[in-house]
Each structure stands twice: as C-alpha cells, then as structure tokens.
C-alpha cells in the first residue's frame, strides 16, 4: 500500500470509528425522538431514525440508497487518482469514504440511518443529521477547493482512471 492510501486509510478508519461511536452513544443514551437541548434555541441532540436521505428524501428506498452509496464509493475511489496527492485531498477522500461508509453500514444493518445533530438557525429547524453527513460535506468542500486550485489534474492519470 502506497503512502497516499495509508494516509487516506487512517483518516477513513478514524472517521468511521467516530461516526459509529457517536451514533451508538446517542442510541444508547437518548430515547428515540427525544430531544436533549444543549444550547438553548440553537442546538439539541435529537435521536431519530432516518429512512431516507437528506431531508428524508427517498424515504423507504433503502436498497436504492445502498446502491447509490456503493456506486459513490467506487466513483470516489477512482477520483483519488485524478487529484494531486496532498494533505487536503487525503483528508477529503478519507472523510468521504468514512462518512459514506458510516451511513452505508446503518442502512445495510438497520434499514435506516441514525441522525441526532439538531440545529435551529434563525427559527428554522434544520433537518437532523449526523457526523457522517458532516464528514461528507467537509470532504466535498475540500475537493471543490482542490478543483478551484487546479489540483484535480495529475499528469499521466488517464490510464489509472480507465482501469
């Protein structure tokens, strides 16, 4: 395993561990659909089972969401070879693999995703989400930064991309 893959693997494992740990702790200590206010009128821990994706879209389409997750992981794996090898990109790919895998595990084993981060911003109750979702969003933002900086082009990468 080359150095690039080791760094991404470490970030992936740490992310996946934190995702599953936080979900398990919330499930163990907070009743389903109960809300524990942490910062008044701003942030609560609210444990819910999400049978869909973001904003509960595609609710009860678990098999489809599992397939989408697996396809996403394969595409992201292939993209690893298109982007320059640097700390930011390693972190981005590790976060993406960890976040997507964390929710994939829930979908495959439980049939739903455990969500618990509940923010109210300017009286808008934002959809409840989890650490895996945060990891995916941060990973995507980091890759967008890489694209704007021109770090998405590696010389002689066409053969790796094709196979």
Q: Whereabouts are the PLM-identified features?
A:
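Alpha-helical transmembrane bundles and membrane-interface segments of multipass inner-membrane proteins
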Residues: 1-163
């Amino acid at each position: 395993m080359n150095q690039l893959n080791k760094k991404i693997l470490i970030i992936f494992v740490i992310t996946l561990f934190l995702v599953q740990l936080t979900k398990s702790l919330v499930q163990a200590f907070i009743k389903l659909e109960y809300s524990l206010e942490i910062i008044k009128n701003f942030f609560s821990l609210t444990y819910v089972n999400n049978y869909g994706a973001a904003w509960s879209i595609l609710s009860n389409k678990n098999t489809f969401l599992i397939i989408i997750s697996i396809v996403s992981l394969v595409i992201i794996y292939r993209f690893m070879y298109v982007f320059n090898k640097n700390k930011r990109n390693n972190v981005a790919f590790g976060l993406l693999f960890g976040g997507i895998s964390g929710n994939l595990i829930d979908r495959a084993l439980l049939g739903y995703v455990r969500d618990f981060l509940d923010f109210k911003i300017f009286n808008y109750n934002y959809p409840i989400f989890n650490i895996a979702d945060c990891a995916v969003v941060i990973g995507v933002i980091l890759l967008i930064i890489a694209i704007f900086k021109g770090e998405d082009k590696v010389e002689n990468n066409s053969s790796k991309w094709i196979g």
